[in-house]
């Protein structure tokens, strides 16, 4: 857990595309540097927010190579390598393990074929035993259709090559895992609205989507907590929570990309089957985020969207 000890606010970063839907590495570098400078201290590349289902194998390898060079060891980098095929997961993870600057592999609970708990243990054990990169469990039942039980996460936490979990379930389950995990096992919530509470409960932090657009406020929230200024930390979380929810009111990452484009990061559109927001959806998102009318179309938002 050494590299993850100081990583409390990690961003599940988008994949920028140009007008021809090629990956735009210049925009990726610009966004990455901005986020690091403003308090994000770790990244997931090639995750759900990075549109990994829409990337080819070769694109992922090239993306991870470029991203390792961009970050250059400044913060931990976690690359998505999971699938619902154990042998393919092992092969791809070992391929990614050869890339400089990739510190961990994010391995999702197998979607679609929906293994039971024994199958999950067998899958993650086989992967962890066979790869040259520490892995992080990605437990996101809302997308996979099946949930890894809290007891199963705890069981797997004792494997020497399973370093952490990104947990997208209830706070009660997160609390159980924090209480019963192996001491060297890191726990991150993948639910932005749980960011403050998870840290108070003893989790290591959050792997966030909202930190793209609210990195200053989230950094201030955690720093206020560490100073013992609970009133400010709580106020910030309450201010953030409805905005965090709004970033998922349409299929992700189209909302966060719309805001980033309006801020001048120019991360482009989404690949099919995810569509960019239409004008009606932009108006609804502006209202939910308390943004000026037509600001997402005019692309005149400031970098800091705070009060």
From Swiss-Prot:
Identification of the protein by name? 4-hydroxy-tetrahydrodipicolinate synthase
Q: Name one GO molecular function term.
A: 4-hydroxy-tetrahydrodipicolinate synthase activity
Pathway where this protein functions: Amino-acid biosynthesis; L-lysine biosynthesis via DAP pathway; (S)-tetrahydrodipicolinate from L-aspartate: step 3/4
What is catalysed by this protein? Answer: L-aspartate 4-semialdehyde + pyruvate = (2S,4S)-4-hydroxy-2,3,4,5-tetrahydrodipicolinate + H2O + H(+)
EC assignment: 4.3.3.7
SUPFAM superfamilies per record: Aldolase (SSF51569)
So what does this one do? Catalyzes the condensation of (S)-aspartate-beta-semialdehyde [(S)-ASA] and pyruvate to 4-hydroxy-tetrahydrodipicolinate (HTPA).
List the CDD domains. Answer: DHDPS
Q: Self-association or partners: how does it assemble? A: Homotetramer; dimer of dimers.
Organism lineage: Bacteria, Bacillati, Bacillota, Bacilli, Lactobacillales
Q: Which organism is it from?
A: Limosilactobacillus reuteri (strain DSM 20016) (Lactobacillus reuteri)
* UniProt cross-references to Pfam families, sorted A to Z: DHDPS (PF00701)
Locate the residues binding pyruvate.
49, 207
Leading EC class: lyase
Give the family per the record: Belongs to the DapA family.
Q: Where in or outside the cell?
A: Cytoplasm
């Amino acid at each position: 857990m050494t590299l993850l000890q100081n990583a409390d606010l990690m961003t599940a970063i988008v994949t920028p595309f140009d007008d021809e839907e090629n990956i735009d590495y210049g925009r990726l570098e610009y966004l990455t540097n901005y986020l690091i400078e403003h308090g994000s201290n770790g990244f997931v590349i090639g995750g759900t927010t990075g549109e990994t289902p829409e990337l080819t194998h070769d694109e992922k390898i090239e993306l991870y190579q470029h991203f390792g060079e961009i970050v250059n060891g400044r913060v931990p980098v976690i690359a998505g390598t999971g699938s619902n095929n154990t042998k393919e997961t092992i092969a791809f993870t070992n391929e990614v393990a050869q890339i400089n600057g990739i510190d961990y592999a994010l391995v999702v609970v197998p979607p679609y074929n929906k293994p039971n708990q024994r199958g999950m243990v067998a899958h993650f054990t086989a992967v962890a035993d066979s790869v040259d990169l520490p892995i992080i469990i990605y437990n996101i039942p809302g997308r996979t259709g099946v949930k890894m039980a809290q007891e199963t996460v705890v069981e797997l936490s004792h494997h020497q090559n399973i370093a952490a979990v990104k947990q997208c379930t209830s706070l009660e389950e997160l609390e159980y895992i924090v209480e019963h995990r192996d001491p060297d096992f890191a726990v991150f919530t993948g639910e932005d609205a749980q960011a403050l509470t998870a840290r108070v409960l003893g989790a290591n932090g959050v792997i966030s989507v909202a930190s793209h657009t609210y990195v200053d406020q989230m950094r201030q929230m955690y720093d206020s907590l560490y100073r013992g200024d609970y009133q400010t930390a709580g106020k910030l979380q309450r201010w953030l929570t409805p905005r965090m929810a709004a970033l998922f009111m349409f299929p992700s990452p189209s909302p966060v990309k719309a805001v980033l484009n309006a801020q001048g990061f120019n991360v482009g559109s989404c690949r099919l089957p995810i569509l960019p927001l239409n004008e009606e959806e932009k108006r609804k998102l502006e209202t939910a985020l308390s943004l000026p009318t037509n600001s997402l179309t005019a692309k005149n938002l400031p970098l800091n969207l705070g009060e």
